[in-house]
Structures are given as structure tokens and as C-alpha cells.
Amino acid sequence: MNVLIIDSGVNGSTKETINFVQYEDNNDYLEHGTLIANIIRAINPDVNIYSAKVVDRGGSTVNDKLAQALLYALFNNIDIINVSLGLPSYSDTIQDIINKLAKRGVIIVAAAGNNTSVYPALYNNVISVGATDDNGNIEPYSAPADVYTYGTVTIDNTTYTGTSCSTAIITGILSRGGHN
């Protein structure tokens, strides 16, 4: 199963890394994309991880970079796209690319957002993921979503919280089961 992580990059082993951030190398300085990859790999060690770096070391990105990463997926045999990031504005171009990906059977899983709803989770043909606590109650910070799962994970004695973690869990589960 080929999973593309659109994020701040992925440190460590990937099938391919594509960098859409000008004047930066492929390193994940924020370690956010690396966290997402580690969560997915914990659920499915056999997954093929591809990385599209669209977030710079300052933590920002724009719709154009997201569109470029989605176009990469459209032409490169990607099965599932994980987008654990959010942008505030709608783009017709991105919705068009998402529709084309959906027609090809590519699943797009996106974080619903922490404290506010964000794109790409708000686009059509995207599975938005929210966060719950250990008892299955929706976390107060979680934006409304299509599906919910745990929003807290612990890796190497460090605890991480947010809809980004929830999104990686759903991506990991989907990557284990295949899809058609």
C-alpha cells in the first residue's frame, strides 16, 4: 500500500521524498510529518511511505504547495493520502484535483482541525478525521468530522495530542485493509 504524507517532510526511510518548499532541504525540522509516519508505521509496518514536504521550518504552507503535492499523487500510483495539516481557504483548483483523485480510487484522509475546521478536511471527497478521548468522547478541541478516533498517542515516552494523530491512525488502519 502506497501512502503519501503531505506535511513537513519525513525523517528516516521513505520510498520517495518530494520537496515543494523552496530553499529548504528534505529534512523535517518540525518533526510533525515524521510523527505521522511513525504512527502509520506502528499500525502497518509494511506500508510504503512517500513524503511530500509542503510545510517550511516556520510551520507555514500555502494552497499552491498542497495542489502540487496532490498532483504528484495523481500521477504516481498513490493509494492513500494523509494530510495532517490545515489551510484556512478554499481553492477550486485543489477541489478539482481531489475529485480526479477520488475518481481514480485514491483515498484522502485529512485532519478536521484543532479548535477550528480547516481545508483540506472541508473539501468534498475527503475523509475528515476528528479526535476522541480514551472513552470515545469527542475532544473539546476537535473540529466536526466524518470519523473520529483517539487523538492522543505516546511514542518513546512522549505524548502527542491532536487531530493530526487521529488522522494518522485512520490512515494506518486503511492502509492495512486495502480499498477498492
Can you annotate each of these PLM segments?
Residues V10-N11, L87, T116:
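Short, glycine/acidic-enriched loop or turn micro-motifs at the edges of active sites
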